[in-house]
A protein has these predicted regions:
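A non-catalytic alpha/beta surface segment that caps or lines the substrate-entry region
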Residues: 77-140
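Bacterial signal peptide processing site
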Residues: 17-21
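Solvent-exposed loop/turn segments at secondary-structure junctions
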Residues: 84, 109, 116-119, 142-144, ...
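Active-site-adjacent substrate-binding region
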Residues: 229, 236-329
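Acidic/histidine-rich catalytic neighborhood of metal-dependent amide-processing enzymes
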Residues: 158-257, 261, 267, 273
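N-terminal capping segment at the start of a domain
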Residues: 51-96, 106, 156, 233-234, ...
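Sec-dependent bacterial lipoprotein signal peptides
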Residues: 1-15
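Ser/Thr-rich, Proline-interspersed low-complexity disordered segments
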Residues: 22-63
């Protein structure tokens, strides 16, 4: 798969030049003499070979690493240059096109899922009904009925917020994980999703998580059986330890694996004290699927015009990305 020009880090293999042994030097011509008896004969001179030059070992290709600078550039592109991304707005459609193009540049097959969003209240702002979309990236020749993983983040924001932490941070990590997966592969085929209309337009499940609910409705029986786990990345750039969460219905297997990986990778994490239902993983969990969530640290700019790129801590973004990549590998 091709890598994104924005986050491209050129890897150059240094191949060694093989040098064979130099030929033996020719012996000097000897004057002709009469035959001697063996006891009187002198040994003939042996040619001396020049030692061969050792063949240098090629340098090993270093493992791909999470590029925090590239992820922060994506946060700035979404929350700084585009800004608020209400799920039914032109700004959302612009951001969805941007994400789709990035996935394509990485070599993924990209589809979009369109779905309706009702009128309502977006964090104090009346909003009209409209349509939103999910952006779905799958590896080439992906078979949805075979064992696979999903990792996703919602792309939309409430009406007034630029949404740097909520949730350009999650989308930026998803894009960087997709790049790494294209370079090195993952333990199971992985689907990357930017969900639309996660943010509520009212209270209760019926007015929340529209994109992920639509995705789950579209899953056939074989796809549900093939999905081994879904992880949502939501608000992953604030704090000094990565929140590791699960919901009230799913087994804690994903959460526990994250905690073990964090110990191995020496990444600071915190187990969520309560079951979490406030992100897109909840739509999958309600359908009986295994899920987890990274993120959810409270912060002052939540759902406000103050949710700007400067809110996002690059170190926390890196912790989240490295932990998620360890889970995918």
């Amino acid at each position: 798969m091709r890598r994104v020009p924005l986050a491209a880090v050129a890897l150059l293999l240094l191949s060694g030049c093989t040098t064979g042994a130099e030929p033996a030097s020719e012996p000097s011509p000897q004057p002709t003499t009469s035959p001697r008896s063996p006891s009187a004969s002198s040994p003939s001179a042996e040619p001396t070979a020049t030692p061969s030059t050792p063949e240098p070992s090629p340098e090993a290709t270093p493992p791909a690493r999470f590029d925090t600078d590239a992820a922060m550039a994506d946060v700035r592109a979404l929350a700084g240059r585009i800004g608020p991304r209400l799920a039914t707005s032109p700004a959302y459609r612009r951001s969805a096109r941007l994400v789709a193009q990035r996935f394509r540049e990485l070599g993924y097959d990209v589809t979009t899922q369109s779905f309706p969003v009702p009128a309502g209240d977006s964090w104090g702002v009346p909003v009209d009904a409209g349509r939103s979309s999910n952006v779905v990236a799958t590896p080439a020749d992906f078979d949805r009925t075979e064992p696979h993983l999903i990792i996703g983040a919602h792309l939309d924001t409430v009406a007034v917020a630029p949404g740097a932490e909520d949730n350009a941070s999650g989308v930026a990590v998803v894009l960087e994980l997709a790049r790494l997966a294209g370079l090195e592969g993952t333990r199971l085929p992985t689907v990357f999703v930017a969900f639309g209309a996660e943010e509520p337009v009212g209270s209760g499940d019926a007015l929340h998580h529209f994109g992920s609910r639509h995705y789950v409705r579209e899953m056939g029986r074989g796809q549900r059986q093939g999905l081994q786990a879904m992880v949502s990345l939501d608000r992953v750039g604030v704090g000094n330890a990565v929140p590791v969460c699960t919901g009230p219905l799913s087994p804690a297997s994903v959460q526990n694996r994250f905690l073990r990986l964090a110990e191995r990778e020496r990444i600071r994490v915190q187990r969520c004290a309560e079951p979490n239902t406030t992100s897109d993983h909840w739509s999958f969990e309600k359908a009986g699927l295994t899920v987890g969530r990274l993120g959810s640290t409270p912060y002052a700019g939540y759902h406000s015009a103050a949710d700007l790129p400067r809110v996002v801590n690059p170190r926390q973004l890196s912790r989240t990305g490295r932990l998620a990549w360890a889970w995918l590998r």
